[in-house]
């Protein structure tokens, strides 16, 4: 099991946890909209670090983005396995062809 899979399992386990005992549980308790807002904030921070060119800071912010993506997905009951299956479905397809195939 990869670190991303372990993190996704931890996020899923926190769905029923006491919001006072877990940051993840607190985010999930605040609903999908708050989870999406936090994801957006972290994405912007990653973009800023990408522009600045600080590799270590970008890696740190990218880790935050991945965590908050998993929380946002969990808030809408979308699993990492579903996302991975979609990536596998797209694998080997050019981006132009994949986008055209969406309709």
From Swiss-Prot:
SUPFAM superfamilies: all-alpha NTP pyrophosphatases (SSF101386). CDD domains: NTP-PPase_HisIE_like. It is an enzyme of class 3 (hydrolase). Keywords: Amino-acid biosynthesis, ATP-binding, Cytoplasm, Histidine biosynthesis, Hydrolase, Nucleotide-binding. It holds the Pfam family PRA-PH. GO terms for molecular function: ATP binding; phosphoribosyl-ATP diphosphatase activity. It comes from the Bacteria. Its EC number is 3.6.1.31. One of its GO terms (cellular component) is cytoplasm. The keyword ATP-binding applies. Pathway: Amino-acid biosynthesis; L-histidine biosynthesis; L-histidine from 5-phospho-alpha-D-ribose 1-diphosphate: step 2/9. InterPro entries: HisE, PRib-ATP_PPHydrolase-like. It is found in: Cytoplasm. Its main location: cytoplasm. Coiled coil: none annotated. It catalyses: 1-(5-phospho-beta-D-ribosyl)-ATP + H2O = 1-(5-phospho-beta-D-ribosyl)-5'-AMP + diphosphate + H(+). GO terms for biological process: L-histidine biosynthetic process. Belongs to the PRA-PH family. This is Phosphoribosyl-ATP pyrophosphatase. It comes from Cereibacter sphaeroides (strain ATCC 17025 / ATH 2.4.3). The gene is hisE.
